[in-house]
Swiss-Prot record:
Name used for this protein in its record: UDP-N-acetylglucosamine--N-acetylmuramyl-(pentapeptide) pyrophosphoryl-undecaprenol N-acetylglucosamine transferase
GO molecular function: UDP-N-acetyl-D-glucosamine:N-acetylmuramoyl-L-alanyl-D-glutamyl-meso-2,6-diaminopimelyl-D-alanyl-D-alanine-diphosphoundecaprenol 4-beta-N-acetylglucosaminlytransferase activity; undecaprenyldiphospho-muramoylpentapeptide beta-N-acetylglucosaminyltransferase activity
Bilayer disposition of the protein: Peripheral membrane protein
Reported function: Cell wall formation. Catalyzes the transfer of a GlcNAc subunit on undecaprenyl-pyrophosphoryl-MurNAc-pentapeptide (lipid intermediate I) to form undecaprenyl-pyrophosphoryl-MurNAc-(pentapeptide)GlcNAc (lipid intermediate II).
Sequence similarity: Belongs to the glycosyltransferase 28 family. MurG subfamily.
Enzyme's top EC category: transferase
Binding site for UDP-N-acetyl-alpha-D-glucosamine: 10-12, 124, 157, 179, 277
Organism: Wolinella succinogenes (strain ATCC 29543 / DSM 1740 / CCUG 13145 / JCM 31913 / LMG 7466 / NCTC 11488 / FDC 602W)
Alphabetically ordered keywords of this record: Cell cycle, Cell division, Cell inner membrane, Cell membrane, Cell shape, Cell wall biogenesis/degradation, Glycosyltransferase, Membrane, Peptidoglycan synthesis, Transferase
Chemical reaction(s) catalysed: di-trans,octa-cis-undecaprenyl diphospho-N-acetyl-alpha-D-muramoyl-L-alanyl-D-glutamyl-meso-2,6-diaminopimeloyl-D-alanyl-D-alanine + UDP-N-acetyl-alpha-D-glucosamine = di-trans,octa-cis-undecaprenyl diphospho-[N-acetyl-alpha-D-glucosaminyl-(1->4)]-N-acetyl-alpha-D-muramoyl-L-alanyl-D-glutamyl-meso-2,6-diaminopimeloyl-D-alanyl-D-alanine + UDP + H(+)
Length: 336
């Protein structure tokens, strides 16, 4: 069957697309992808052999635009939708699966206009505008936060489960700023570094490409040993080494940490659309599976309290809560 995956913009959306691609490819399906020329879509999938064809259309986000910029964004989305219609027809696509993000709009709307079944995965606890609009017209709407969802497990790649382990005491901390880094987390890491080092705890830090040189100087000036990196696609290998993560609350990071059994202190990005990272972290907090602090409330005391805890119960509960095989269950559902 010819199936098209669409969506992206950020690593969170694209991680879901990759997990679904791997599962559907293992079931001998012919896969196609439509993303955007902007964002990270091209860097993730331009050379991805799991897709038979990959298309990157000229689109940009609409939600945060105003005035003329919003009109231009809507116009680019409409033109891209017309291109997507041609792609779907030319390649006889039978299913379209959206993983969200502004780059999902053209192919999703094209699918509905052509009567092709549309499946939507919502990665966040707070439903995005596009998915909210398309949900009533979709064949199925899947969400890990929705009690009415037919599949509630989050599609995390097997690699994160394969290196999972139970943590107890903190010997190494991993700072995670998401696929693009986070200046607030970077700054807090430098503030905490002397205290962490004094306690004999090792530091790993994913700081993003833009802030890499500044962070490198910052650790050197403090004479703090650190494993510093801008970004790593094999982030599961970094997680496996850590005992505690300090992270943004993007959905994929949140569930990947859970699959790995790695307890985390979440610092939601305060300017995320609809404050969705706060609601993502709150969902985990409400299950008793992690910690959360608002960016404006960061303090040394927050970390000190966690360092005194035995993490084994949270770690074990995370591993039990996040189920393996969600991508396969979603793939089977889409093919049924």
């Amino acid at each position: 069957m010819n199936i098209l995956l669409t969506g992206g913009g950020t690593g969170g959306h694209l991680a879901i697309a990759k997990a679904l691609m791997e599962s559907l490819a293992s079931k001998n399906q012919s896969l196609f992808f439509i993303g955007s020329q902007r964002g990270q879509d091209r860097s993730w999938f331009e050379h991805e052999e799991g897709f038979k064809r990959r298309f990157f259309l000229e689109t940009q986000g609409v939600v945060n635009q105003r005035g003329i910029a919003k009109i231009r964004s809507l116009s680019s989305q409409f033109q891209a939708m017309l291109e997507a219609r041609k792609i779907l027809k030319n390649h006889q696509i039978k299913r379209v699966v959206s993983v969200g993000g502004y780059s999902a709009a053209p192919a999703s709307l094209a699918a509905l206009s052509l009567g092709i079944p549309l499946y939507i995965h919502e990665q966040n606890a707070k439903v995005g505008l596009l998915n909210r609009l398309l949900k009533p017209f979709s064949r199925a709407f899947l969400s890990s936060y929705d009690s009415n969802s037919l599949i509630r497990d989050y599609p995390v790649r097997d690699a994160f489960f394969e290196v999972a382990r139970v943590r107890s005491r903190v010997k190494k901390i991993l700072f995670l700023g998401g696929s693009q880094g986070a200046k607030a987390i970077n700054d807090w890491a430098l503030e905490l570094a002397p205290l962490i080092h004094q306690r004999g705890i090792a530091i790993m830090h994913q700081c993003g490409e833009v802030d890499y040189e500044r962070m490198k100087r910052g650790y050197e000036e403090r004479s703090i040993p650190v494993e510093l990196f801008a970004f790593d696609r094999a982030i599961h290998q970094k997680m496996q080494q850590a005992d505690l993560a300090i992270s943004r609350a993007g959905a994929s990071s949140l569930w990947e940490l859970g699959a790995n059994g790695l307890p985390a202190l979440f610092i939601p990005y305060p300017f995320a659309a609809g404050d969705h990272q706060y609601y993502n972290a709150k969902f985990i907090l409400d299950q008793g599976l992690g910690w959360m602090v608002r960016q404006e409330n960061l303090s040394t005391e927050v970390l000190l309290e966690i360092l005194e805890e035995d993490l084994s119960q949270k770690s074990e509960c995370l591993m039990a809560y996040v189920k393996r095989g969600a991508a396969d269950r979603m793939a089977d559902f889409i093919l049924s």
